[in-house]
Design a protein with these regions (language model features):
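C-terminal extensions
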Residues: 1-8, 12-91
Length: 91
């Protein structure tokens, strides 16, 4: 089992997304930025993904970096504020 699968917000869909992105470990994930992963996933798959995918990326990166376990929806309000301000990932 990948150590990514041990992170709180990682299920089958997130594991599949990480595979598409080439992210194979928690250590590698810790060096990533959620914005970059989201934009890259959309580009590689040729489709815009639900913004909640970004929230999952943010939560898992946070856990990988700090060890603090937070639900993915904790990151939703800040993402929505960025979207409202026009500062969310440009695809």
């Amino acid at each position: 089992m990948s150590d990514l699968a041990k992170l709180k917000n990682v299920g089958k869909a997130a594991l599949a997304d990480f595979a598409v992105l080439g992210v194979t470990s928690t250590a590698q994930l810790a060096a990533c930025e959620a914005d970059d992963l989201y934009v890259k996933l959309c580009a590689l798959t040729g489709q815009r993904h639900d913004p909640c995918v970004y929230d999952v990326f943010a939560a898992t990166i946070h856990q990988a970096r700090t060890g603090e376990v937070l639900d993915w929806w904790v990151f939703t309000p800040s993402r929505k504020e960025r979207m409202k301000a026009g500062n969310f990932c440009r695809i």
